């Protein structure tokens, strides 16, 4: 088994904290950590960066804290990204964050796409909005996305068993990407 550290960057695109988007990503990270012990996990929470992002029209005007998050994204071995669905798309500050990321830095990086919304009708946002964004970066978007509607949560905690099954399927593709034997924690 590969024992080198895998730098995982988790981007939670919600403007609120706590949020269902964060809850979905947290469940994903916990299941990933149950499978692999060689992870270095870095969280980028848009809710904590609203002021820094709105005050940074260009990369060179970004605060030191925002620069650290941008560098973490650019150096990631694996990205886990999620956003709530607003008006059939991801949040504006989520997009603005990636506007500041070097356009060549994510080439070939595997990305797990996730979204949350009020109903199942928003599930296509993953394929119609998130996947094209990361295609621009020439990132490797993994085939299974994670979408969870409000019914999958108790407050901000993921509770729906079918969602945990989807997470395991996603993690199987992550394991295959890194050529790690699949040993499901389910």
Curated annotation (Swiss-Prot):
Protein name: NADH-dependent FMN reductase SfnF
Family: Belongs to the SsuE family.
SS bond list: none
Induction: Transcriptionally activated by SfnR.
The protein's enzyme class: oxidoreductase
Annotated EC: 1.5.1.42
Catalytic activity: FMNH2 + NAD(+) = FMN + NADH + 2 H(+)
InterPro entries: Flavoprotein-like_sf (IPR029039), FMN_Rdtase-like_dom (IPR005025), FMN_Rdtase_MsuE-like (IPR019912), NAD(P)H-dep_FMN_reductase (IPR051814)
Pfam families for the chain: FMN_red (PF03358)
Gene3D superfamilies noted in UniProt: 3.40.50.360
GO molecular function terms noted in the UniProt entry: FMN reductase (NADH) activity; oxidoreductase activity, acting on NAD(P)H, quinone or similar compound as acceptor
Keyword set includes rRNA processing: no
Organism (species): Pseudomonas putida (Arthrobacter siderocapsulatus)
Keywords (A to Z) from UniProt: Flavoprotein, FMN, NAD, Oxidoreductase
Superkingdom of the source species: Bacteria
Function: Involved in the dimethyl sulfide degradation pathway. Catalyzes the NADH-dependent reduction of FMN.
């Amino acid at each position: 088994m590969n024992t080198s550290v895998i730098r995982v960057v988790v981007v939670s695109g919600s403007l609120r904290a706590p949020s269902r988007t964060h809850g979905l990503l947290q469940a994903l990270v916990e299941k990933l950590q149950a499978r692999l012990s060689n992870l270095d996990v870095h969280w980028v929470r848009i809710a904590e960066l609203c002021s820094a992002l709105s005050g940074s029209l260009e990369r060179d005007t970004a605060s030191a804290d925002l620069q650290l998050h941008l560098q973490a994204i650019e150096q990631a071995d694996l990205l886990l990204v999620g956003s709530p669905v607003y008006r059939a798309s991801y949040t504006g500050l989520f997009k603005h964050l990636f506007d500041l990321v070097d356009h060549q830095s994510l080439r070939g990086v595997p990305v797990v796409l996730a979204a949350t919304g009020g109903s199942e009708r928003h599930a296509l946002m993953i394929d119609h909005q998130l996947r094209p964004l990361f295609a621009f970066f020439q990132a490797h978007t993994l085939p299974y996305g994670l979408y969870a509607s409000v019914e999958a949560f108790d407050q901000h905690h993921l509770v729906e068993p079918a969602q945990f099954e989807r997470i395991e399927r996603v993690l199987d593709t992550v394991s295959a990407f890194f050529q790690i034997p699949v040993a499901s924690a389910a």
